[in-house]
Amino acid sequence: MPYELASWLLGQWSGLSVSASTLWNWVQTKGEQAQADLEAQLSAQSEGQPVTPESLSAMLAALPLAIAADGVMVPFRPVANTPKGKIKWQEIKIAILARLGTRVNRAGAVVPQLLNRRLVAVLGDIDRFIPSLQLEARRQDFESAPQVVWLSDGGRGFWRVYRTCFAHCAVAVLDFFH
C-alpha cells in the first residue's frame, strides 16, 4: 500500500494525522530493528543455542506441517527509486511453512486450509537461505509435528536443503521437475 494512502486511511479510521514520510520513517526504523533481531537469532542458532518454538494450540500442533520452497530471479536497478541503470538479476529464495487444516466451504465441501502460515524470504543463494529456513522450521517445532511434508520443484539446491534439514522427518513431494 502506498504511504500516501496509508496516511489517508489512518486519518479516516482514527482521526490521527500522520504524514506519509513519517510512516515511511517508522517502517524503516521497525525494519532495521526486525533485521537486527533476525541477525541475532541466526547468530545464536549458528552457535548452537536452542530455538524457542512458537506457542501453538493443541489443535494446531496436531496438524501436519507443510514446508514449500522455491526460488525466483528478480530484476534490480543500480539506482534506487529510479528506472536508471542496467538491470541486474538477483536470486531470491522463498518458503512457506503452514499447518495443513481443513474447512467447510459455502457449498458444504471440506477443502484444505493453510493455518499458521509463516514466510521466509532471502535475497541470495541457497546457502544463505538455509539458516533462515532452519530457524523458522525450529520456531514451528517441525520435529514434533505429526507429519512434515517438503514440497519443492526440481530447482537446483532445494533437494540439498531437504536432505540436509528435513530428510530425517519429512516426506518429500516433487511438484515440477525442471
Where are these regions (language model features)?
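Catalytic center-proximal scaffold of phosphoryl-transfer enzymes
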Residues: 1-177
